[in-house]
Regions:
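Interfacial helix-start motif at the membrane-water boundary
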Residues: 54-73
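Interfacial segments of alpha-helical transmembrane regions
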Residues: 88-103, 154-162
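Membrane-interface transmembrane-helix boundary segments in multi-pass integral membrane proteins
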Residues: 9-14, 65, 179-215
Length: 232
């Protein structure tokens, strides 16, 4: 019998690896909340917004508005679910996991190419930065490639998965206009205007669909390979 995509089973090594990924991603987010609770926010040099968040609950509840936090949260939660029970996941899980994977890869690319500067960070913050912007963006797609589960990426799920970052963008821009704060300089509406940020948004959204399409293509190729091997 040729195994279907839904019968793909993740072994102990895959479950353990996803447990480590969940620990890293969710642990890093917990550390971000701690920093928000103990430190005030800062404004990047040249930014057009003026809002500062004081240390404590204000800056703590602001942390989930960062794309990095959201990406690591999506990957961390889906990795935890795979570590606990890797089989029987449906369409919603597949779309959410794909969204997390693609968003986290984008996090690594955009932050390290466009947003990273030469500021010397304290050790704790530097470790957190490395985990959220380098380690998890590499580890998450690597574990997907090694352990699957396969057959969960479809055209409909690619489209559905994009609703999450689009919703994040809408909330970020509406909230930014209300409270005069934006998480990144590439979304600095007061300085760049909506036309200016549209260049970045369009490029990143295009990158999202390119990466999601790549995940889809690779997934289909691997499913075919498994079926051919099983039929031989």
């Amino acid at each position: 019998m040729i195994p279907s995509a839904g019968r793909h089973r993740m072994g102990a090594a895959g479950r353990a690896a996803h447990g480590v990924l969940a620990l890293l991603a969710l642990g890093a987010n917990a550390a971000s909340l701690f920093i928000g609770a103990t430190e005030s926010s800062t404004i990047p040099e040249g930014a057009g917004w003026t809002r500062l968040w004081a240390a404590g609950w204000q800056n703590l509840v602001n942390q989930p508005l960062f794309f990095t936090f959201m990406s690591n949260f999506l990957v961390g939660i889906t990795a935890l679910l795979l570590a606990l029970r890797p089989s029987g996941r449906g369409a919603v899980f597949g779309a959410v996991r794909l969204s997390g994977l693609v968003c986290l890869v984008i996090t690594g690319v955009v932050f390290n190419v466009l947003l990273r500067d030469d500021t010397l960070l304290p050790l704790f913050t530097a470790v957190l930065d490395a985990v959220q912007h380098v380690i998890t963006p590499i580890l998450a797609p690597l574990l997907w490639l090694l352990f699957g589960p396969r057959g969960q990426v479809t055209g409909r799920r690619v489209l559905a998965s994009a609703l999450i970052p689009v919703a994040w963008l809408v909330v970020t821009l509406v909230r930014g206009a209300l409270v005069d704060w934006y998480p990144y300089v590439i979304l600095d509406v007061p300085t760049l205007g909506y036309a200016g940020i549209a260049v970045y948004v369009g490029a990143i959204l295009g990158l999202y669909f390119v990466l999601a399409g790549l995940f889809w293509w690779v997934d289909n190729r691997l499913v075919r390979r498994v079926r051919v091997a099983a039929a031989a």
